[in-house]
């Protein structure tokens, strides 16, 4: 999907600057998991940390396939609350940054409304 390709490109951009072998990127997902929540007017969002390895010897296509598998696994666990993940990992907390990831990747796929101006098409 477009998201997978763009996330792969984002990780490569991170790698260009940081030169790490692994990145943890936050992925916001809609947390409307029940019928009752679908009609609520509220931002129901959960953030899943994605542990994304980067193999410098891999081709772009191979990286896309690796990240695709990680995304499918993340969606299977989307009911996990972020606070539960933080407790399970037991990382040191700091007011200066999020406990598990320091960057997020989000793709808005909502169609944009075209502005309407008098006399302009």
Located regions from the model:
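Adenylate-forming
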Residues: 1-121
